[in-house]
UniProtKB/Swiss-Prot annotation:
One Gene Ontology term of the molecular function aspect: protein kinase activator activity
Domain of life: Eukaryota
Protein name: Cell division control protein 14
Originating organism: Schizosaccharomyces pombe (strain 972 / ATCC 24843) (Fission yeast)
GO biological process entries: cell division; regulation of mitotic cytokinesis; septation initiation signaling
Pfam families named among the record's database cross-references: CDC14
Subunit (UniProt): Interacts with sid1.
GTP-binding keyword on record: no
GO cellular component, one term: new mitotic spindle pole body
Localization terms from the record: Cytoplasm, Cytoskeleton, Microtubule organizing center, Spindle pole body
Length: 240
């Protein structure tokens, strides 16, 4: 498995989108087999998870590098115009793979506790980006921020919440994107975990409501809906 992961990493770290796709397909295949193991499965989950603990074989890091490369490619208008459908689909697939990786290996969430990495999502949350990528970016953000108050605080510091509100209020924003942003708001307004590891970064629901209210009206209404419908299950407000 080390060879498989290393080969995928080499492709993902190339600046060529076609080579990135090869690496992505390799990681995608591994994640699929790990997430849905069968009796004759050749990729034991335990081995994969142990390898993901190693910086040498972790698959999330090269995926982040690939995302940076593809977003840079988007800035090259001439090249992007010729391949925009291919690049958009590749970015979308890449975000889905990142989701899978952090869900299977939650320790990889810590790789996103970095402002430069989180800024990649700011690029994806521009009104000019296609709805498909905006939606995928919002879903991925929830996965990488779940139970990670530090990542949420860093995203606030780079004006990530403000940018999400800009997209939410933009006239041309699709209903799909708005729906996904609403789901993110509910996630954001939910209680954060309380433990010695995260207490220094944790905010209460009231603090987050006040922060979000700087950029969005009727946040109290969102919180009331969250309390009433509890889309993520019963809210633990012990420390709020």
């Amino acid at each position: 498995m080390e060879d498989l992961l290393n080969n995928a990493k080499q492709h993902l770290c190339m600046r060529n989108p076609k080579l990135i796709r090869i690496g992505l397909r390799q990681v995608e295949s591994i994640v699929y087999h790990v997430a849905k193991p069968s009796h004759d499965d050749k990729i034991p989950r335990e081995i994969f998870l142990k390898l993901q603990d190693s910086p040498l074989y972790n698959s999330t890091t090269p995926c982040i590098y690939a995302l940076d490369s593809l977003l840079e490619y988007q800035q090259n208008e001439e090249a992007y115009e010729k391949n925009f459908q291919f690049i958009q689909k590749l970015i979308d697939d890449l975000l889905h793979v990142i989701e899978g990786l952090v869900l299977i290996h939650p320790k990889s969430q810590t790789l996103f506790e970095d402002k430069a990495t989180l800024r990649l999502f700011i690029h994806l949350l521009q009104p000019s980006q296609p709805s498909m990528l905006q939606v995928a970016a919002m879903k991925t953000l929830v996965c990488i921020m779940a139970d990670r108050p530090l990542a949420i605080r860093l995203f606030e510091q780079i004006n990530g919440l403000q940018q999400i509100c800009v997209v939410f209020k933009h006239k041309q924003t699709s209903q799909d994107t708005r729906f996904q942003i609403l789901e993110f708001f509910y996630f954001y307004l939910s209680p954060e975990p309380y433990s010695i590891d995260v207490i220094a970064y944790r905010k209460t629901r009231t603090e987050k409501q006040a922060y979000l209210s700087k950029y969005l009206s009727n946040v109290q209404g969102l919180r009331d809906d969250l309390d009433k419908f509890q889309p993520f299950g019963k809210l633990d407000e012990t420390f709020d």
